[in-house]
Amino acid sequence: MRTKAGGESALLLLDAIQILRSADVDYAIVGALAASVHGLIRATSDADALLSINTSALMALERSLNAAGFKTELRRGDVSDPISAVLTLRDEFKNSVDFLVGIRGFDPKAFSRTIEVALDGESLKFVALEDFVAMKLFAGRPQDLVDAKGALEAAPEPPNMELLKELAKRYGAETVRSLESLLSNFSRDIDSGLELG
């Protein structure tokens, strides 16, 4: 493994992605690492990625990760939980990676919209702007709302508003209201209009 100290969760993620690739599991990096790709810099001690895998295949992936030397913990959500399962990887330096599976409302087409960014000489897949913003609005915590607004402000081009509206609808009425509020307060002119219909 590449990690040599704490604060290197991104390197732990790089190692884990090798296992994902060999198991033919698609992924999209989210969370603070994705925020940095979308123009928001903030400290993080972990790394997060969504996996395109069902929860039963997740157990086989966990065995592969264990065989490769990763320490894992698999937690399953109940019916009221917006996340079906989380597979957490840790190393001896307390670096951690959360692999998320089955987020309620998440569009599986997001895996085909990922953007590739090089890290440590490897090409990694990050969630696209519209998916990032919709997920942050769905999470709904104050920092998530700040991240959604900041990502839109930092974007070099306006988002695909039609897609963003559709993604918000997938997450439910509260996410739609959050998007409407964000856009009504948005200081920059966004193409395609602001009204959700």
Model regions: which residues?
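Compositionally biased terminal segments of proteins
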Residues: 1-197
